[in-house]
Amino acid sequence: MSTTTITKAKNFDVETITYGEPQTNARGGKSIKIMSGGRAINLQFPITFTWGVNKWEGDNGAPDKFDMSLQFDKSNISSKKFLDAMVALQSKLITDSVTNSSKWFGRKKIIPEVAEAMWWPMVKYRKDKNTGEPDMDSDPSLKVKIGCYNGEWSVDLFDMTGNPTFRSRVSEEIAETIQGSKAPVDLV
């Protein structure tokens, strides 16, 4: 029986990242498991503000999707370390997509600029109203997917004392339980 190891985001080292083989889903899209030290990545985030869970209705019989944006607070040391870890992960994924372009994209070689253009950023900054460029002085956010497959949630939420506030395999009321809250998050 394996045990789950949870890493604090401030201790996360992108140099431990490894990848699984590309998998093709029923719709033809590809996904690649991202692992740390050969295991699933389980990160514990510092207290982070969120505007709640978003529900995106699936088209043509596709299942609904759920996500939430976590707001970084650059003035908070723990949050800044979490941000730095996510920016480092984002950079590593772009670099490794160039190295693995043949396996991942079926292209012999791509240049970093192409990989970056194909990439949808994980860490997002609001746009400057005048220039349309990212406002790097603002507090960025990180969008995370929340798994719900065939009505089964793949997320557990706990309060500050470690007591469960939401356990997986519960109804879609999760979207209403954490709206506008600040909570530490373990991303599995």
Placement of each model-derived feature along the sequence:
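OB-fold ssDNA-binding interfaces and closely related basic DNA-contact patches used
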Residues: 1-153
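Extended serine/threonine-enriched, polar tracts that run as long, contiguous segments within proteins
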Residues: 128-188
